[in-house]
Amino acid sequence: MKRILAVDDSTMNLKLVENMIKGEYQLELLGSGFDALAYLENNTVDLVLLDLLMPEMDGMETYDRLRELENGKNVPVIFLTADTDIESEITCLKKGASDFVRKPFMPEVMRNRIRRVLELDELTHYLERKVMEKTAQIEKMTFETIATISSMLEARDSYTKGHSVRVAEYSVMLAERAGWREQAILNLQHIALLHDIGKVGIPDHVLNKPGKLTEEEFAIIKSHTIIGADILKEIKSIPEIEAGARYHHERYNGTGYPCGLAAEEIPAVARIIGIADAFDAMNSKRIYRDSLSSEVIRKELVNGKGTQFDPYFLDIFLQLFDEGKLRRRKESE
C-alpha cells in the first residue's frame, strides 16, 4: 500500500484528507513543516500533501528543505491551499511540485489528483529502471566488444597476450583509488583496452623483432600512437579515447612521443595508462627478456617519478603496489 504524508497546521483539514482517502493508502498526518522534516529523516513516503500557508515554516520553505533530505529529494509533492493567487500556483509548479489542490477539498478531485500523481511517479520510476537496464546491457556489450578487439590484436604476439586487459585493470584500480567517478572510470577502462590498437598497422617483423630495433624500426613502432588515434578519432561515445591511444607514451618531463607534451598538457587518462602500461611491460616476459623482479620494478617506477610518470598518480600506484594489489603475471598467462 502506498504511503502518503499529509502536512497541515489545521487538524480539521487533516481529518478531511483522512476521510477522503482512508483505506486506499497508508496515511501519516502531521501538523507542521518541522514535524514533516523530522519524520522524513528516518522514513520514506510515496507522496507528500503539503499545506502552503502554515505558521513558523510555510509550505515553500518546507518544500525547499524537504528536497535537501535523502528521503525527500525525489518524492512527489502536491500543494494544498486556500490561496487563490495564481502566482502562488505558478511558483509551486516551477519549484517542481507535482500538482496544486485548492481548499475546500472536493473528495473526487483530491482522489483523482493523488491517483494521477502516484501513477505518473510509478511510470517514471519504471522507465528509469528500464533505461538503466538497457544502459547496463549496452555497456556490457561495449566492454565485451572492445575486449574482443583487443584480444584479436594481441593474438599476433604471445608475449603481449592479455597486455591491454591488464593495463585496463591497473588503470581502473588507480582511478578508483584517486576518487574518480564511476562513468569516468568506465570510460578509462575502455580507453585502456584500446590504447595499443595502432599496433595493427605495425609490420610483424618489426613488432616481434627479438633484438634491438634500429632507429628506423623504432620510428615505425612509435607511429602506433598516431595510427591508433586515427583509428579511434571518430568514436564520440567514449570521451578521450583518441587521446589515450595518442598520448600514452608521452613523458611527464616532455621527452616522450609523439608530441612531446609535458605535465598537465598530457590528458589524465594517458598519464594513468602510461604508468599501467610501463608496469605491465616490466612485469611481463618479453621476447628479448624475462619479467623483472618486484624490487627492480618498484625501483624503476620510483626513478621515473616526475620524469616519465606523473608524481601524483605514481604515488597512488605505488600504494597499490606496496599493498600487493598488483598481481605478478604468471608465465602461463
Model-identified regions with their sequence ranges:
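Helix N-cap/capping motif at the beta->alpha junctions
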Residues: 29-38, 59-61
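Active-site beta3 strand of CheY-like receiver
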Residues: 43-50
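Receiver (REC) domain active-site loop signature in two-component systems and cognate sites
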Residues: 54, 62, 66, 92
